[in-house]
Amino acid sequence: MTSSPVSVLIHGASGRMGQALLRLAVQDPALQVVAAVIRRAPAQRVVDGVPYFAAAELNGAPAFDVAVDFSLPQGFDPVLALCVARGAALVSGTTGLDEAQRQALADAAARIPLIWASNFSLGVAVLNELVERAAAALPGWDCDIVESHHVHKQDAPSGTALTLGE
């Protein structure tokens, strides 16, 4: 039995994670990238068989099963609203969300399949568990998180550091 590929919209396709996702997704026969969304109007509408859309054109994107969002906080609300309106799943790694956006995320999780994480790496998931265990074992202790990043890092402190600090 052959199933059809999962149709994917990649939101934030011009960023580091978005570009990495695009490279991998177009090679996976189980996936079909139906749209790549970037902030500004693209120079080319189709690149390597993938249709590109400006963020302002998001509502004109074709139907998709799941949106994968690694954008910026200011681009997050429209993709969340589109997923809810279309009943599509959302996977998001966008960090720096404000309280209203976090609440909208929680509300949407009751209506659509949704996963959000500040960092999707296995190493950080294990680190997060270890930090929780250490905090429980050492009540009354203080700790600091010190981090360094490449020069292109857009959010500091990082979403990962903020999650660990929670």
Give the predicted meaning of each segment.
Residues 4-8:
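Extreme N-terminal starter segment of soluble prokaryotic enzymes
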Residues 24-47:
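NAD(P)-binding Rossmann-fold cofactor-contacting core
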Residues 49-63:
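Short acidic low-complexity segments
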Residues 80-81, 85-86, 93-114, 125-134:
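Rossmann-fold NAD(P)-binding glycine/threonine-rich loop
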